[in-house]
């Protein structure tokens, strides 16, 4: 469950100011944040995944954000990352490896998951998201849509209960958008909570 209570945030030099917002999202809900550029959609996603206040420098924050019982400003990022998976507008910004297989398992290895469990999560991810065509690939040889699909898979492998997607279709063509739509359908079927900041609504 996500609870945003009377939250205000103002960047030092950027748009995206929030003023006294309240938002409650129940487990399993899919919520789409829409609005003009600079209205604060991405800022809300950063409240949920902890980038605000843990990584965004400066700015003024007030109010309370609670994710699965954890007060975000008081919770270490690694604990938030166990619950909240983020897919960003530019997938290249979240890659840590050159080959696709290592990218899928990177988060699990970094979290100290035992090899047997890593193999199980890897196989479950490939099966659920139907990404066999991405395996054994060099990331630099992939299209933008394939990179986005791989980024989604690396998050899925971590098995978060909440997915946060920030403008995920911004750089995708029609086929890649349809692939993303199928992936979102899959996590909705599994009862995950989904928060999407988006300007395209037709694919949802």
Over which residues does each language-model region extend?
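ABC ATPase NBD Q-loop/coupling interface
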Residues: 64-79
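Conserved ABC ATPase signature
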Residues: 138-142, 146
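H-loop/switch region of ABC-family ATPase nucleotide-binding domains
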Residues: 198-199
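Conserved ABC ATPase "signature" region
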Residues: 116-134
């Amino acid at each position: 469950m996500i609870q945003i209570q009377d939250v205000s945030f103002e960047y030092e030099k950027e748009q995206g100011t929030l003023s006294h917002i309240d938002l409650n999202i129940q487990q399993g809900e899919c919520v789409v944040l829409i609005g003009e550029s600079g209205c604060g959609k991405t800022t809300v996603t950063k409240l949920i995944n902890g980038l605000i206040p843990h990584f965004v420098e400066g700015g003024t924050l007030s109010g309370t954000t609670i994710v699965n019982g954890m007060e975000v400003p008081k919770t270490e990022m690694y604990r938030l990352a166990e619950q909240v998976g983020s897919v960003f507008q530019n997938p290249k910004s979240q890659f840590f490896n050159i080959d696709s297989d290592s990218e899928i398992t990177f988060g699990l290895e970094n979290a100290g998951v035992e090899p047997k469990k890593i193999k199980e999560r890897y196989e479950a991810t490939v099966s659920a998201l139907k990404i066999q065509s991405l395996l054994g690939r060099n990331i630099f040889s992939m299209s933008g849509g394939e990179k986005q699909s791989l980024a989604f898979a690396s998050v899925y492998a971590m098995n978060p209960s909440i997915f946060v997607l920030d403008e995920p279709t911004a750089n995708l063509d029609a086929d890649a958008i349809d692939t993303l739509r199928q992936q979102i359908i899959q996590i909705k079927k599994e009862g995950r909570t989904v928060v999407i900041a988006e300007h395209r609504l037709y694919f949802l």
